[in-house]
Amino acid sequence: MDRTFVMVKPDGVQRGLVGEIVSRFEAKGLKLVGAKLELLPEGRVVEQYREHLEKPFFPGLKAYIMSGPCFLMAWEGKGVVAVVRRMVGATNPAEAAPGSIRGNFALDIGRNVIHASDSPESAARELGIHFAAGELVDYSRIDEPVLYE
């Protein structure tokens, strides 16, 4: 089964959206295999967003991510990276579909509530940044036989 990394950013945590976001993914049939609430240190923020290091918005992004706790999650499911990205919505909330997480809860591209890996390769890299090997749990959901062929 595939895995992906999802992070509720400080604005989402501070607005009390963690439960709503977890509920949406669970209702879809995805399996939560790791979760923790953390104040991210600078080194991990830089590693997480390394593709943006030279962009003019990076200092603000780094300060924002470090401004409060983030809720880090590992999710598992068939095609989970694409499923989660669709549920999260476009990076720019103005372009996010109504009903998506960003479409419903975000107003500003700089405070867009949530991060989700954009490819299986990014998911593996980001999970490795934020979770140690023993922190992810293998188990079966009782409804898996109903969800998957």
Swiss-Prot record:
Q: Does the entry feature the keyword Nucleotide-binding, yes or no?
A: yes
A molecular function GO annotation: ATP binding
Name the Enzyme Commission number(s) assigned to this protein.
2.7.4.6
| Name listed for the protein in its UniProt record | Nucleoside diphosphate kinase
GO BP annotations listed: CTP biosynthetic process; GTP biosynthetic process; UTP biosynthetic process
| Highest rank taxon of the organism | Archaea
Q: Which InterPro entries match?
A: NDK-like_dom, NDK-like_dom_sf, Nucleoside_diP_kinase, Nucleoside_diP_kinase_AS
- List the Pfam families: NDK (PF00334)
State the needed cofactors, names only: Mg(2+)
Q: What is its main location?
A: cytoplasm
- GO CC terms: cytoplasm
Keywords, alphabetical: ATP-binding, Cytoplasm, Kinase, Magnesium, Metal-binding, Nucleotide metabolism, Nucleotide-binding, Phosphoprotein, Transferase
What this protein catalyses is: a 2'-deoxyribonucleoside 5'-diphosphate + ATP = a 2'-deoxyribonucleoside 5'-triphosphate + ADP; a ribonucleoside 5'-diphosphate + ATP = a ribonucleoside 5'-triphosphate + ADP
What is the role of the protein in this entry? Answer: Major role in the synthesis of nucleoside triphosphates other than ATP. The ATP gamma phosphate is transferred to the NDP beta phosphate via a ping-pong mechanism, using a phosphorylated active-site intermediate.
EC main class here is: transferase
Subcellular compartments: Cytoplasm
- Which residues are responsible for catalysis? 115
The entry's family comment says:
Belongs to the NDK family.
Binding residues for ATP: 9, 57, 85, 91, 102, 112
